Regions:
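Short, non-ligating residues that shape and space the ligands of small metal-coordination modules
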Residues: 199-203
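Conserved phosphate-interacting/catalytic interface
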Residues: 1-188, 229-581
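Short Cys/His-rich metal-coordination motifs, predominantly Zn2+-binding knuckles/fingers
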Residues: 196
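Cys/His-enriched microdomains
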Residues: 191
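Short microdomains enriched in Cys/His and/or Lys/Arg
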Residues: 204-242
């Protein structure tokens, strides 16, 4: 289903002219060898541009790259472009004392020239290709001039730098001319394609995917020779037959989705998250903002995207009634292969509804300093040690995304990490962090399928008689009394007693209630009456004798939300506060 969905995406985008035709791809070429129509070298030209502070090679629509690997990879040359070993016979690291590297460069160059001749035989009157052949007819002379060019040192700074040829009077590389006939590669291997269901030439080696941290030749589909996974003596790609056309379609689609300027992917640690829809929809444009960090040049973009989603039923901003599918793919690359960690296929309408429910479940009263909605990354940062995402289990992100998209309960692992951080950091760095933790616990509890308790509300619920929730409220009241009685403190009862009160309230409740009586004596008469009444109203609903010896993790979560709700009630605007000064 993954490959079929990618092929369908390619077909749709190619029909709109947004993807290259079969046999071509968008390729970054950092340097061009400029020649005249006689094949004489003119100059080296850099195409690199400054994009977001980084140098990026200009993209050209060139003949699609061929897969190559193993000790005979030198024999496979790309069509009209390749790295400096193939195009200029340069040895690795420019080490002319390494005889093996010199021979390899020469063999690569011979393969490239043979490929140019093959294409020239199909395009006998093409001026550009004939100029390349003429260039190699006077190769030694041209190489002497290339080595004196001011950009030569920069060109050879890194191995594997791709280059192509450009005629001096043209603006694009010679290979960018789509009228050039490339000729289909002959293959003896034909079979039933698993993607299209048609009998076609099979790709023995699938094309590589340009993914971050993916090494040199990462592939989504690959087989190692003689690895023990060969069926019926079939080698490599013949074990899972995918046609050359389908291989081209799915890799072109995936590489387009992964392109630097594409908004159809984002990153989480070493994972790459790719998504797309089979019909144009605002949800596809906004999807990454639901889960990623906001862009530096538009810090409110995430909140705007979520706000549009939440208002969509009334405003029509996000047309979630579109009858189409939405796809999500989480990939984790290594040196040679790409692991699929998560694959989601759902309808646009269903996913929009599930996402709306997800953000509604996360909605909780908060300070005016906090953002209106919480994207996933800030949420996860709030429960990570030192707010570093690398300190979280890799699977947590995938499970959170899956919960949001499918409308499932949140992973218990998220609850556990959240409670750990609350106990380890009684006073979080910011109101946003505190809000995120409370929001996560509220969403976790309300989405439990077997939750027999009252649903937790966005703000303080005085009708909620859950014992853990009431204990949390009581603890917040006792802490507030202490703060008003003793002024600014380096530490409050929260620093010393939060962990024990939230786990085993019976052990410390009586002691803290007695302590609060001493604190009440230091308040004004009006404050004493107000807090005595508030404390009494909560305590009369707590069955002290019936409290469990230990609160479960779910009840510890209710305690945390009760505490948070009550604290937020205290810190409303002055005109809404009931405290008597």
């Amino acid at each position: 289903m993954i490959l079929q969905a990618l092929c369908e995406y390619y077909d749709r985008m190619a029909a709109l002219g947004k993807m290259p035709s079969f046999g071509r791809e968008w390729k970054g070429i950092p340097y061009l060898i400029v020649i005249d129509d006689k094949g004489n070298f003119v100059k080296l030209e850099s195409t690199e541009e400054d994009v977001d502070g980084k140098k990026r090679a200009k993209q050209f629509c060139l003949p699609h790259g061929k897969g190559r690997s193993g000790k005979n990879s030198w024999a496979v040359a790309q069509s009209l472009w390749d790295h400096t070993g193939y195009v200029l016979a340069l040895p690795k690291k420019m080490n002319y004392e390494d005889k093996k590297a010199i021979v390899t460069g020469q063999k690569q160059n011979a393969s490239f020239i043979a490929e140019v001749r093959r294409i020239a035989s199909l395009n006998e009157h093409d001026k550009g290709i004939l100029a390349i052949l003429s260039f190699y007819g006077k190769f030694e002379e041209n190489m002497k001039r290339i080595k004196t060019d001011s950009l030569f040192e920069q060109l050879t700074k890194n191995d594997g730098t791709n280059v192509a040829f450009r005629l001096i009077e043209e603006e694009t590389p010679i290979g960018a001319d789509t009228s050039i006939a490339l000729g289909d590669e002959e293959t003896e291997d034909t079979g039933l394609c698993l993607v299209t269901g048609k009998r076609l030439p099979i790709a023995v080696i699938n094309s590589k995917v340009n993914i971050k941290n993916g090494g040199t030749t990462p592939k989504l589909v690959s087989f190692q020779k003689g690895s023990g996974f060969d069926s019926y003596h079939k080698q490599q790609g013949l074990n899972a037959p995918i046609s050359v056309q389908a291989d081209y379609a799915y890799t072109t689609a995936l590489n387009t989705l992964l392109a630097p300027k594409s908004r159809n992917h984002f990153f989480f640690n070493n994972d790459t998250i790719v998504f797309w829809a089979d019909k144009d929809n605002q949800l596809e444009d906004d999807f990454s903002f639901f889960f990623s960090m906001p862009p530096k040049d538009d810090p409110n973009r995430n909140v705007e995207a979520i706000s549009n989603l939440m208002k969509a039923p009334w405003t029509g901003t996000v047309n979630d009634q579109t009858k189409g599918n939405f796809y999500l793919l989480v990939l984790s690359p290594n040196n040679a292969r790409i692991a699929v960690k998560l694959w989601e296929e759902t309808t646009i309408q269903q996913m929009a509804g599930n996402l709306r429910d997800y953000f509604s479940d996360l909605d909780i009263v908060h300070s005016s300093k906090c953002r209106a909605y919480v994207p996933l990354i800030p949420l996860l940062k709030s429960v990570a040690l030192q707010e570093d995402l690398k300190n979280l289990p890799p699977a947590l992100f995938q499970e959170m995304v899956r919960s949001a998209i499918e409308g499932l309960p949140l992973p218990r692992l998220a609850q556990q990490h959240c409670l750990q951080r609350i106990k380890a950091e009684p006073h979080p760095k910011s109101a946003e962090t505190e809000r995120c933790r409370a929001a996560l616990l509220k969403a976790y509890l309300n989405r439990l399928h077997d939750n027999q308790n009252k649903q937790l509300t966005m703000a303080l619920d005085v009708e909620n008689k859950n014992q853990a929730y009431l204990c949390g409220r009581l603890f917040a009241i006792l802490e507030r009394i202490q703060e008003l009685a003793q002024g600014d403190l380096n530490a409050t009862i929260k620093d010393r007693y939060y962990g024990s009160f939230s786990r085993t309230p019976n052990l410390v409740m009586a002691r803290l209630v007695d302590l609060s009586n001493h604190h009440l004596a230091k308040l004004s008469k009006g404050q004493q009456v107000y807090f005595e009444r508030m404390k009494g109203q909560v305590m009369e609903s707590i069955n002290a004798a019936g409290l469990p010896a230990h609160f479960s993790l779910d009840d510890q979560s209710r305690f945390a939300i009760g505490y948070y709700h009550q604290r937020q009630e205290f810190f409303k605007k002055k005109e809404e506060q009931l405290e008597t000064k």
